[in-house]
Curated annotation (Swiss-Prot):
Additional facts recorded: Binds two calcium ions per molecule with an affinity similar to that of the S100 proteins.
Molecular function as annotated in GO: calcium ion binding; calcium-dependent protein binding; protein homodimerization activity; S100 protein binding
Name by which UniProt lists this protein: Protein S100-A11
Post-translational modification: Phosphorylation at Thr-5 significantly suppresses homodimerization and promotes association with NCL/nucleolin which induces nuclear translocation.
Length: 98
């Protein structure tokens, strides 16, 4: 039986595979696939953005090899960054309660 961490890793892989490949290459997210992922899986984050260009800038910043697509490692950089931001927010909130 997989551990909680192993299940999380499996879920990340499954989500990446769910969105990649619709435009042809199943090892990368195209810009369209990235936008679909963001608007579906991270809808609360996307809806709270006041700047309509934020997703385009995120894609460019995450696309380290500048090929116009996100591979799995670049995708994980997004997930890691969001996890760090959420963790920091959680820590700040819990410290205010003390």
């Amino acid at each position: 039986m997989p551990t909680e961490t192993e299940r999380c890793i499996e879920s990340l892989i499954a989500v990446f595979q769910k969105y990649s490949g619709k435009d042809g290459n199943n090892t990368q997210l195209s810009k369209t696939e990235f936008l679909s992922f963001m608007n579906t899986e991270l809808a609360a984050f996307t809806k709270n953005q006041k700047d309509p260009g934020v997703l385009d800038r995120m894609m460019k910043k995450l696309d380290l090899n500048c090929d116009g697509q996100l591979d799995f490692q670049e995708f994980l950089n997004l997930i890691g960054g969001l996890a760090i931001a959420c963790h920091d927010s959680f820590i700040q909130t819990s410290q205010k309660r003390i």
